């Protein structure tokens, strides 16, 4: 999940 640390949507 690349967006896990960013927003956690993917």
Curated annotation (Swiss-Prot):
One of its GO terms (cellular component) is extracellular region. One of its GO terms (biological process) is neuropeptide signaling pathway. It is found in: Secreted. Keywords: Amidation, Neuropeptide, Secreted. The modification Arginine amide is found at residue 10. Myoactive peptide. Increases the amplitude and frequency of spontaneous contractions and tonus of hindgut muscle. This is Tachykinin-related peptide 4.
């Amino acid at each position: 999940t690349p967006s896990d640390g960013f927003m956690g949507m993917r």
